[in-house]
Amino acid sequence: MKTFISLIVNFYIIFFSVSISSQNLNDLVLEPGFKISIFADNLDSPRQMAEGKNGTIFVGERNGKVIALIDSDKNGQADSKIIVANNLTYSTGVSLFDGDLYFSEISKIWKIENIEQWISSYNSDSGMPKKILVVDNLPNDKWHGWKWLKHDQDGNLYFNVGAPCNVCLSDNPQFASILKFNNDDLVYVAKGVRNSVGFDFHPLSNQLFFTDNGRDWLGDDSPSCELNRVDFEGQFFGFPFKHASALMDPEFGNMNSGYDFIDPILELGAHVAPTGVSFYNGTMFPKQMQNNLFVALHGSWNRSTKVGYKLIRVEFDEQGNVVNAKDFVSGWLKNEKVSGRPSAPMMKKDGSLLLSDDKANVIYRITYSEQA
């Protein structure tokens, strides 16, 4: 057991040793052969993560910071933290491409060039790295303002703009969509998307898969949250006219939308609140988990009995259709008491899976061994 130590230098860097006792993992249930440990704790509402070529883990925290976590001795626990951006608004999304770190605010997207080079030369006189504005014309409505960022293999940056409401129609077409930033142009990838805060590209087909949070106040069991697949850009996924596979909205369902609605490929359940997702194509986990999608169910907030609060694993056939979905990690919800809220999974280059938790303020590390 390690003892927690902290040292702050110039307010930007913290050295620490993870205290396993700070988070009780005994109640968590995993599939056979898997173990869960703490990669980093004492964080501040961590959400999306991205890994640099040198193994640095970048994290968007909901409190207005983007941090870098460094496991210098490669023991599976972060031992230092550097704040690379602060004083941000709704700072959850992060993505890396070609050595540059991209991160979000509610209405802006920034980047820091050669971020790991800056980290490698960091000292107490470094100050904060220079950030460059990439996108600055997004809506600033706070309702569903959290962003998820993801680059495709060509360097196009994908991000979400959630609906500014529970259910409504807006004159601004950017709302309720997933867009990509391509050569200074904004392209609509998916429309009619109420609030997606998790998407990833299939490792083989490169198709975009995304979750969507269903609307509220239609009862405990309706409508379902969704997992969707984009077959071509510009498809319309129903909001606000239609929810899940078959539920027409009581207010907007009779309107002529002018769109063909695309049904979800998987209904996840009402109010489970899917957030981050990550496809797995590493070598540590069993072979049958190749190209599975891990989906964080953040958990309900307005249901008479709580649901969600777990990480699930979704299997697909060769056509990208869902074959099976099952719990991968559960146990954060017990007797209506919640000990954690899984936020976003991320596969590390070593094949392990990181999982952020913005209630327990930790990042877990999940590993596999046949002897476990």
Regions found by a protein language model. Give the residues of each.
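Asp-box/WD-like beta-propeller blade repeats and closely related beta-sheet repeat scaffolds
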Residues: 90, 95-97, 107-152, 160-164, ...
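Conserved beta-propeller blade signature
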Residues: 56-60, 100-103, 156-160, 207-211, ...
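Blade-edge beta-strand/turn elements of extracellular beta-propeller
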Residues: 24-41, 74-87, 115-140, 171-198, ...
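Blade-level signature of beta-propeller repeat domains, shared across WD40, Kelch, NHL, RCC1
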Residues: 346-371
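Beta-propeller domain segments
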Residues: 23-30, 146, 163-166, 181, ...
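Short loop/turn segments immediately following beta-strands, especially the blade-tip
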Residues: 69-75, 112-125, 231-237, 313-321, ...
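A short loop-to-beta-strand structural motif that recurs across blades of beta-propeller domains
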Residues: 65-68, 100, 108-110, 177-179, ...
